[in-house]
Amino acid sequence: MRAGLSIVLSILFFCNLNAQVANEADFKKKFALVDGYLFDGDYIKALPISKELYNYDSTNANVAYMLGTSYLGADPDRKIAIRYLEQAVGNVSLMYKEGDYKEKTAPGITYYNLAKAYHFAYRFDDAISNFYNYRSFIDLEDAKTYNEVKRQIEYSENAKLLIEQPVNIKVQSLGPVINSQYEDYSPVISADGNTLIFTSRREGSTGGKLFYDGKYLKIFIFQ
């Protein structure tokens, strides 16, 4: 009886060990996919897989960074990213190993992404603070990145002033070509005032394919 019990326990231990290895192997595979999608800027594909990784290991700062970055790039409501990026900046490391699925700390750029998320949430002081935090991770010879962060800080400072000193505007429909019955938002006007760029959830966009939330999503450009 004791021998039989030992055999059963050995089998259970072996099965659990195999399950653990299988989960780690699956994690490694999906981590590589998300890492590649984020590198390519394909946040829509990265988002659902990032969620799976986070469900598997919700204490992993690197995974939280991936999920937050995916939300920041893919979801129209970028404020969702804040929760995960705030978690990730709690364990940022200068020794971060890029592309390593065993890495549990987050990269320095997490501060930059969190700053962007704060900016979209109108939390401009928090955005500015985190842009400055990110500057300590920039190579002294990387003038391009340094200047980009400087420009983002100026954007947040200007946005803060605009919110504190609002300007009266008149909202006017631009007609059915521009305004649809669906959600149209995030308009941007080019510097010369001749081009309008905005996001729309109108039917038939995204090549006829639905976004992960069951709606269409496309950026429209009108001149």
Please annotate each region the language model reported.
Residues 43, 77-78, 124:
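TPR-repeat structural position
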Residues 25-56:
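Alpha-helical segment of the N-proximal tetratricopeptide repeat
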